[in-house]
């Protein structure tokens, strides 16, 4: 399925998310979240890991049974249209936060947050304001 919003890049906010595989306690709920809600496709998968892709972004997940959700990180996705993406997530049954404007490094961004319930990951989606 083609989507109007383009994911341009990903970077970890307080972790290596997007650069290293993200630990998850169970693969299935995360693969479902990434595909159904976030609009990723499965690029590769085995019993212990999955690679997921949307546009220019690839995320990797690895099963880590002793992963503590309290240590889960956050990541920032640079996207082409936060308003359309937020609506896409609402249509998929998610509950994203409101769009707000924040300043970081002297630049202003329109962004919103979406929390993942399985392992406590927090995703931020933004674009220059």
Predicted regions and their residues:
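N-terminal beta-strand motif that seeds the catalytic metal site of vicinal oxygen chelate
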Residues: 1-31, 58, 73-75, 126-129
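A generic "binding-loop/recognition-motif" signal
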Residues: 27, 48, 57, 82, ...
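Conserved active-site tyrosine of GNAT-family acetyltransferases
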Residues: 30-35, 89, 120
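Vicinal oxygen chelate
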Residues: 1-10, 16-26, 53, 66-129
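Conserved short beta-strand elements that form part of the metal-binding/catalytic scaffold
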Residues: 41-73, 122-127
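Conserved acetyl-CoA-binding loop of GNAT-fold acetyltransferases
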Residues: 37-42, 93-95
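A generic "structured core" feature
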Residues: 30-31, 50, 59, 94-98
């Amino acid at each position: 399925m083609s989507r109007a919003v383009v994911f341009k890049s990903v970077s970890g906010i307080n972790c290596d998310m997007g650069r290293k595989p993200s630990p998850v306690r169970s693969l299935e709920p995360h693969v479902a979240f990434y595909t159904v809600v976030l609009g990723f496709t499965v690029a590769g998968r085995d019993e212990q890991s999955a690679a997921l892709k949307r546009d220019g972004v690839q995320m990797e997940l690895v099963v880590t049974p002793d992963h503590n959700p309290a240590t889960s990180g956050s990541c920032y996705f640079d996207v082409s249209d936060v308003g359309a993406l937020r609506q896409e997530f609402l249509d998929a049954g998610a509950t994203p936060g409101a769009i707000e404007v924040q300043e970081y490094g002297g630049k202003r961004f329109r962004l919103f947050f979406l929390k993942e319930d399985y392992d406590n990951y927090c995703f931020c989606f933004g674009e220059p304001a």
